[in-house]
Amino acid sequence: MKNYDKKITLLPRGINDLLEKKSFQDSFLSQTLMNSFKLNGYEKVNPPMIEFEENYTLFLDTTNKQNIFRIVDPISNKPMYIRNDITPQIARIAANKLYKTTDKVIRLSYIGDVLRPIGSQLHPERQIKQAGIELYDAPNVSGAVEVISTGIQALTEIEISNLIIDITMPNLANLIMDNAKLSGQLIQSAKSYLKVKNINKIKTIPTCGKILSKIADSAGENERALSKLNLIDLPPKAKKLIKDISLICDKIKILHPNVKITIDPIENRGFNYYSGIGFAIFSSNVKRELGFGGEYTLNLNGKKHNGMGLSILFDGLLRATQIKDNQKRVFIPYKHKTSILAELRKNGWITIISHNKKALNKEEAKIYNCSHILNGTKIEEL
């Protein structure tokens, strides 16, 4: 290949083509996930790839405004963003629905690409397909159980096994620090220690360092973690959160006894707008997070609505899946009866038509990965 040819075929770092095998897997995963969401009552919506930046923070308390592509709309001269997360868009759509209705739980699903200027350690790709569900105005415990269970069902449908649910409490450390009335500077120091889970440094935090270190040390298998957390003297709001987590774990175990549950009470990376309950989904078969979600607040005309969501990222799925295209492929020689092709396709055959005038070219059939060849009106296995 000439140097000129090499230059024009380069793609930006973290931006990739999906070739035949991965493209098939991507389509299969998309269709199967969305069908599973639909069967659980989630209705699909399709927000645009780009919209006004002001919409991004209108309904959620906190969003990731740093890692985002920005442009200016040449028509309105207003700043716009290329989405790096679809959840804020679903929050916008849900807000319109909640404004028009009362006493109704809203279930929405979505799928689409997101684009990020910089990849992360967990997700180095910059263009990723994201699929997910959002549940609004359901009680937090039953809502969390429904969303997590729906995610487990969907991933099981696409043959991802050995699932692990890692439950976190993004707001737990904040509850402890607020109760201790720490200064802003001490809170920032504490958050930096918690982020890297430096137990010795956490212990040095005045007033609440001992409690925070015990919370950090409780991480692990859910029964062990909950047992340790229940021994800690926590403020009422924190105790209520621990009780809710315990109920969620019990219900998930009943619904999905083969799924492992762990608890990491101080983990909050990637849970920007989540509060209360958060979770991530892993498989022991792949070293990458498959999905994440949790509880958040939707602000609408001064009223707060409870949201519970799940986002599944395809970079991890495409590494985890072993799905193959097993659809039958039949090689059609140059001279054939055209009337038979429609019937073959109707019966699920992929037809590969030869442009080679040779009568029965079995070698050519193998090149196109055909398992069968058409001989007259009969299909013969190669």
Name what the model sees in each region.
Residues N162-A173, A190, I261-N268:
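Short, surface-exposed recognition loops or helix-turn segments adjacent to catalytic cores
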Residues T150-I158, N171-A180:
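Hydrophobic mid-domain F-helix/FG-region of cytochrome P450s
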Residues P47-K65, T168-D178, E267-G276:
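Beta-rich nucleic-acid/ligand-interaction surfaces
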Residues P139, G143, D166, A173, ...:
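Cap/lid and interdomain-hinge subdomains that line or gate substrate/regulatory clefts
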Residues M1-P88, V145:
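TRNA-binding/sensing appendages of the translation machinery
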Residues K2, F28-N40, F52, T87-Y99, ...:
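Positively charged, Gly/Ser-enriched RNA/tRNA-binding surfaces
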Residues N67-I75, K181-I205:
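Acidic, His- and aromatic-enriched active-site or binding-groove loops in soluble protein domains
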